[in-house]
Amino acid sequence: DSPGGASDTQKQHXVNSXXXKXY
């Protein structure tokens, strides 16, 4: 995950699990 805020990290994790981006 890209460094940022805790909320941003959680959001990206969710998106990563669901859609599998490239984070």
Curated annotation (Swiss-Prot):
Provide the residue span(s) of the region labelled Disordered: 1-23
**GO MF terms held by the record:** oxygen carrier activity
Q: Where is the signal peptide?
A: none
Q: Its domain of life?
A: Eukaryota
Chief subcellular location equals secreted
Q: Which GO terms describe its biological process?
A: oxygen transport
**Any Gene Ontology CC annotation:** extracellular region
Protein's UniProt keywords contain Secreted: yes
Could you tell me in which tissues this protein is expressed?
Answer: Hemolymph.
Q: Where, subcellularly, is it found?
A: Secreted, Extracellular space
Supply the alphabetized keyword list: Copper, Oxygen transport, Secreted, Transport
Chain's role: Hemocyanins are copper-containing oxygen carriers occurring freely dissolved in the hemolymph of many mollusks and arthropods.
Into which family does the record put it?
A: Belongs to the tyrosinase family. Hemocyanin subfamily.
Q: Name it.
A: Hemocyanin subunit 1
Source taxonomy: Eukaryota, Metazoa, Ecdysozoa, Arthropoda, Crustacea
